[in-house]
Amino acid sequence: MKQPSRSSPPPRIRAKQRRRAAGAPQPAPRTAVFLDRDGTIGEEMGYLNHLRRFHLYPFAARAIRRLNRRGIPVIVVTNQSGVARGFFPEALVRRVHRLLQKRLRAAGARLAGIYYCPHQKSDHCACRKPKTGMLRQAAREHALRLAGSWIVSDRYSDLRMAPRVRARSILVKTGYGRGDYQWHRKTWPRQPDRVVEDLAAAVNVILRSRR
């Protein structure tokens, strides 16, 4: 079964193995915030087939920085089926993610990891959202607790992951979100936990929930 790809630095697996071997106590798993990429952090461009087409929303870095300051891991999980469809090479996905990390770092923000699925639906992989493969891989590699974590996206289909791992969901009205909410919400079998204007508003909800 095909597995998700990652664009973040390799996890410190050896150090973790040494701690386990030494019998050292393991840190309690933390909850995290999982963000979609296109339409949530950056502008929705359809199939993003060139580096110059990537544009970070002006509020995104500050929103992520606020989560960083509270010690909340922030992880991107994104479907990039354009790779499987032959619209662009997988190397471009990694270049976009390096640029994303660079721009966030310049604004004092950081991501704990970026995971992407390069497959299309017909590949029957384990990682394409709304399947939970990317979430579960991130949880293993970063010692996270999915139950109680947050999933934020402009696509309702992504938020279908949330009940499968007992996470909470926020639909943002950037990207496809506004139209998805206006025209399709009555057909949704389960409503998102919250619906807000953008990522900045989503972070307000998340931080208030932790008081």
Regions found by a protein language model. Name each.
Residues K16-I75:
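Active-site neighborhood of HAD-like aspartate-dependent phosphohydrolases
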